[in-house]
Amino acid sequence: MIQMQTYLTIADNTGGKVAQCIKVLGGSKRRYAKIGDIITIVVKQAIPNSSVKKGDVHKAVIVRTSKEVRRKNGTYVRFDDNACVILDANLSPRGKRVFGPVARELRDANFMKVVSLASEVI
């Protein structure tokens, strides 16, 4: 579960390293976001000469959460960190690579491009 002020790692090669959630999209009173939800982030740390800079505001999709997610078959999946992938205006990933595993729930949320870029889908 991601809410406002939550720090996330950026799991793509846009050059950002750490981001902070500043808004959960999808309703004015919406408080929490889960895997596959779109949030607004601000970049807190970035590597030099990258396409995203510190202080930039972007939309992102959540690909990993520390809070477990229950699946239809009764199993739970949990990750070591909270991570997101930066999106462009068309809601497609801005980077060309996705680092680390991503959850299968992204397939249900119609983020097939993120799933295809990921090295491992859990």
Curated annotation (Swiss-Prot):
<dbReference type="GO" id="GO:0022625">
    <property type="term" value="C:cytosolic large ribosomal subunit"/>
</dbReference>
<dbReference type="InterPro" id="IPR036853">
    <property type="entry name" value="Ribosomal_uL14_sf"/>
</dbReference>
<comment type="subunit">
    <text>Part of the 50S ribosomal subunit. Forms a cluster with proteins L3 and L19. In the 70S ribosome, L14 and L19 interact and together make contacts with the 16S rRNA in bridges B5 and B8.</text>
</comment>
<dbReference type="GO" id="GO:0070180">
    <property type="term" value="F:large ribosomal subunit rRNA binding"/>
</dbReference>
<dbReference type="InterPro" id="IPR019972">
    <property type="entry name" value="Ribosomal_uL14_CS"/>
</dbReference>
<keyword id="KW-0694">RNA-binding</keyword>
<keyword id="KW-0699">rRNA-binding</keyword>
<dbReference type="InterPro" id="IPR005745">
    <property type="entry name" value="Ribosomal_uL14_bac-type"/>
</dbReference>
<dbReference type="GO" id="GO:0003735">
    <property type="term" value="F:structural constituent of ribosome"/>
</dbReference>
<dbReference type="Pfam" id="PF00238">
    <property type="entry name" value="Ribosomal_L14"/>
</dbReference>
<comment type="function">
    <text>Binds to 23S rRNA. Forms part of two intersubunit bridges in the 70S ribosome.</text>
</comment>
<keyword id="KW-0689">Ribosomal protein</keyword>
<keyword id="KW-0687">Ribonucleoprotein</keyword>
<protein>
    <recommendedName>
        <fullName>Large ribosomal subunit protein uL14</fullName>
    </recommendedName>
</protein>
<comment type="similarity">
    <text>Belongs to the universal ribosomal protein uL14 family.</text>
</comment>
<dbReference type="InterPro" id="IPR000218">
    <property type="entry name" value="Ribosomal_uL14"/>
</dbReference>
<dbReference type="GO" id="GO:0006412">
    <property type="term" value="P:translation"/>
</dbReference>
